[in-house]
Amino acid sequence: MQDTNGIENFVKNFAKSYYTWSNSKEAIEARTQAINGYLTKELQDLNVDTIRTDIPTSSTVTDVRVWSIGQSGTDTFSATYEVDQQIKEGEQTSNVKATYTVKVHVDADGDMVIVQNPTLAPAIEKSDYEPKTPEADASVDADTVNDATAFLETFFKLYRTATEKELAYYVSGNVLEPISRDYLYSELVNPIFTKDGDNVKVKVAVKFLDNQTKATQVSQYELVLHKDSN
């Protein structure tokens, strides 16, 4: 499988040059020289005069995010990326965000060149997906719920500072690794218990206070609890 880290860096560096400009002759020549280091001769010609000295704006790139890289032929890859620009026109400054796709050819020795000009693409939006919320199992009796809740509260109070040896008393098979952070346990949030043979599964959020940042940190866990006969 192709390592795409190099392609990602290549695209990011190209985008920083491509979307940065000002309307002086020297700056435009410097931009042209920079982007020509990434483009085929055909694309170099295509981009002549895209930024000219009579353009009323200047642009600074504030961020580039590569969202995806996929194979698009034997040795060609399609990269989708988002660019944040700060556009200045006279005394007015605005922030602009847009998503584009380019295609990158990669030689056998790893050399790269862009073979498709930046082409507008749909923005990457937040998905509407919501995971199905598990429902509490009525077969888990009240005593078991109380015992399990008490166990979880005890465990998470010590978990923040517990050593690997101390965790071994509560946890089997390194299911939870030591964190050794200055957290203060606050509360369990909406624990949902379900039967799993002789065991009980729990899905729970745990609130901690981070004593360094003073922010509340909410961690989510899915655990299987086993009660020893003794």
Give short role names for the model-derived ranges.
Residues Q2-T57, S127-S180:
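Core segments of small alpha/beta cavity-forming domains
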Residues T50-I69, P178-F193:
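A short, amphipathic edge element
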Residues D3-E8, G70-S72, K195:
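Short, solvent-exposed beta-strand/turn "edge" segments of beta-rich domains on protein surfaces
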